[in-house]
């Protein structure tokens, strides 16, 4: 095969991929024209009927934002008896641990110090935390997340109306500092298009949904 033929073949594949991507996004756009907002929180809630949730948050060298994270978690509206929050720390991350211990930790927040290892990744930390998860729904947050206070109630409402084969829920993300700079505005527009247009459209097309690494909720039974 000549170099020219290989080039033309590669070029054709790339063009076809671009066309397919554009067609998929166009189809998702059309399908998502009628945007369905997330499930509303009922006016009155029977707390005993809410699913029990575990939230996993892996931190590494996050001392500057640790106190803000704990404060944001403290604003969550959900029965403490139905909530388990596990903050995972690496064994050598003493500064983040000290920053967290200086805060007033709610009783439903647990600190898990994992064994020292040469590899320090979010996946490894979450796998450690998963071993002690005891709730029906497992959620994943990042250190910089600032969930709306009623977000878990909305998650519970969506699971309550979903069929049993719906095991995963990706909540929408947005930037809280969208107006800070031109770059933050661009990111905010990108996230808005992705989570309010593209992903809802893919869901209606019954396509595979790409999941993010945060604000993600799964049934414990599938993990």
Give residue ranges: language-model regions:
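A conserved hydrophobic helix/loop-capping motif in glycosyltransferases and polysaccharide synthases
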Residues: 54-62
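Short, well-formed alpha-helical segments that are part of the catalytic scaffolds
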Residues: 62-75, 95
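Short aromatic/hydrophobic "clamp" motif used to bind/position activated sugar donors
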Residues: 138
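Cell-envelope/extracellular polymer assembly enzymes that use nucleotide-activated donors
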Residues: 51-54, 84-86
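N-terminal membrane-anchoring/stem segments of glycan-assembly enzymes
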Residues: 1-47
């Amino acid at each position: 095969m000549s170099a020219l033929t290989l080039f033309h073949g590669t070029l054709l594949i790339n063009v076809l991929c671009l066309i397919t991507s554009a067609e998929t996004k166009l189809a998702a756009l059309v399908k998502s024209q009628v945007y369905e907002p997330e499930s509303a929180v009922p006016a009155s809630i029977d707390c005993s009927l809410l699913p029990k949730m575990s939230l996993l948050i892996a931190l590494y060298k996050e001392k500057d934002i640790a106190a803000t994270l704990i404060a944001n978690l403290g604003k969550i509206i959900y029965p403490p008896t139905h909530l388990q929050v596990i903050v995972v720390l690496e064994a050598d991350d003493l500064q983040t641990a000290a920053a967290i211990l200086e805060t007033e930790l709610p009783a439903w927040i647990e600190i898990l110090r994992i064994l020292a290892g040469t590899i320090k990744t979010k996946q490894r930390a979450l796998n450690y935390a998963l071993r002690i998860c005891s709730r029906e729904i497992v959620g994943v947050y990042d250190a910089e997340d600032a969930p709306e206070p009623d977000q878990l109630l909305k998650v519970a409402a969506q699971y309550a109306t979903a069929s049993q084969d719906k095991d995963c829920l990706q909540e929408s993300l947005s930037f809280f500092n969208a107006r800070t700079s031109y770059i933050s505005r661009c990111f905010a527009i990108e996230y808005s298009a992705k989570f309010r247009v593209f992903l809802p459209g893919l869901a209606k097309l019954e396509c595979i949904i790409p999941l993010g690494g945060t604000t993600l909720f799964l049934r414990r039974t599938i993990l």
